């Protein structure tokens, strides 16, 4: 794809609004082609390395299925399956894998790791998730939003992110808003707002593209008129229990529930979540949260909202694969 060949995909602000739109158009075409049985394999003979320092269901499956659909072969390197950063430096790993593979996906820790891989690999490197950014998720989110509001351009859409915005999702949403002109509202306690420097940079770009970025602690004001309400988990199994209590106390008022959905004043408002979600007590962590903190029926989102007609989370999950396929096709085929 012209302009993308052999480029890396590390964070959204590495691209222009036009380039982002091109990727979304390609993803929509690839999705339609797959569903109609007309998909053309562009990556036959390509070999792809998938480095996972953090496990994932959606990201791994998306890359693997997308690669297979396009005729490529993959090697999965899990948390215990490589020496990256332990017995071998990131720089050396990049140079080794770059001699064997046509593209490398990295999902793990610091953004500096994926940046180093990109610097030394000599082949396209794709960010499947770092502590700072999650660009492939936002591609899927944007495609899903387009599908559910086909008559509206992004600069006429309002997206609310409720909960903990001081993470890779909050950062990548800022970048997405900067490029698309979304009306993005981060509705969260001030302690959970993203870094001020990134907010300032993205707000200036968003305004140039017809959008706006708002940070507020006021739930009612923040969600008014929203087209989409998005949230993510508050805690993870890797965090100390003391953190759980602190985070839950801080974020309880930002749970996405039927009241918050009604406060939008929009009967057509849709619910988004990057998954996995703790919406019931049917998981190990969900059960612990219910028992220890009384969070029966959901943590960051209630089961009622998650299972409602407003929930489009599984459209999002499917679109991870189509948008990731677009990234690989764009960067590996001329």
Swiss-Prot record:
Q: In its keyword annotation, does this UniProt entry include Transferase?
A: yes
Q: Name one GO biological process term.
A: citrulline biosynthetic process
Q: Which catalysed reactions does the entry list for this protein? A: carbamoyl phosphate + L-ornithine = L-citrulline + phosphate + H(+)
| Keyword vocabulary terms for this entry | Amino-acid biosynthesis, Arginine biosynthesis, Cytoplasm, Transferase
Give the top-rank taxon of the lineage listed in the UniProt record for this protein. Answer: Bacteria
A single GO molecular-function term is: amino acid binding
Which pathway is this protein assigned to?
Amino-acid biosynthesis; L-arginine biosynthesis; L-arginine from L-ornithine and carbamoyl phosphate: step 1/3
Give the residues the record marks as binding L-ornithine: 168, 232, 236-237
Q: Which SUPFAM superfamilies match?
A: Aspartate/ornithine carbamoyltransferase (SSF53671)
Where is this protein localized, as stated in its record? Cytoplasm
PROSITE patterns annotated for this entry? Answer: CARBAMOYLTRANSFERASE
Q: What class of enzyme is it?
A: transferase
Entry GO terms, CC: cytoplasm
Please tell me where carbamoyl phosphate binds in this chain: 56-59, 83, 107, 134-137, 274-275, 320
Function according to Swiss-Prot or TrEMBL = Reversibly catalyzes the transfer of the carbamoyl group from carbamoyl phosphate (CP) to the N(epsilon) atom of ornithine (ORN) to produce L-citrulline.
Q: Which family does it belong to?
A: Belongs to the aspartate/ornithine carbamoyltransferase superfamily. OTCase family.
Protein name in UniProt: Ornithine carbamoyltransferase
């Amino acid at each position: 794809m012209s302009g993308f060949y052999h480029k890396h995909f590390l964070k959204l602000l590495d691209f222009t609004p036009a380039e982002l739109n091109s990727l979304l158009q390609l993803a929509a075409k690839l999705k339609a082609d797959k569903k109609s049985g007309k998909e053309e394999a562009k990556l036959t003979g390509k070999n792809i390395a998938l480095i996972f320092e953090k496990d994932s269901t959606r990201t791994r499956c998306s890359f693997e299925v997308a690669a297979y659909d396009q005729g490529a072969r993959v090697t999965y390197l899990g948390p215990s399956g490589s020496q990256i950063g332990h017995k071998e430096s990131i720089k050396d790993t990049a140079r080794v894998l770059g001699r064997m593979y046509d593209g490398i996906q990295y999902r793990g820790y610091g953004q500096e790791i994926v940046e180093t891989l990109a610097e030394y690999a000599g082949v396209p490197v794709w960010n499947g998730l770092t502590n700072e950014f999650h660009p492939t998720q936002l591609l899927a989110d944007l495609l899903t939003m387009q599908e559910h509001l086909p008559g509206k351009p992004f600069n006429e859409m309002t997206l609310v992110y409720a909960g903990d915005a001081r993470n890779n999702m909050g950062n990548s949403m800022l970048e997405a808003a900067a490029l698309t002109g979304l009306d993005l509202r981060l509705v969260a306690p001030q302690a959970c707002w993203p870094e001020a420097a990134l907010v300032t940079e993205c707000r200036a770009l968003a305004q140039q593209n017809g959008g706006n970025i708002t940070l507020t602690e006021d739930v009612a004001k923040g969600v008014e008129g929203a087209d989409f309400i998005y949230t993510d988990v508050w805690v993870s199994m890797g965090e100390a229990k003391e953190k759980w209590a602190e985070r839950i106390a801080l974020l309880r008022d930002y749970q996405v529930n039927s009241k918050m959905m009604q406060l939008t004043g929009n009967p057509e408002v849709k619910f988004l979540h990057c998954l996995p979600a703790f919406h019931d007590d049917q998981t190990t962590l969900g059960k612990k949260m219910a028992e220890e903190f009384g969070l029966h029926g959901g943590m960051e989102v209630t089961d009622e909202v998650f299972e409602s007609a407003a929930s489009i989370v599984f459209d999002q999950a499917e679109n991870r694969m189509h948008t990731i396929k677009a990234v690989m096709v764009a960067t590996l085929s001329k």
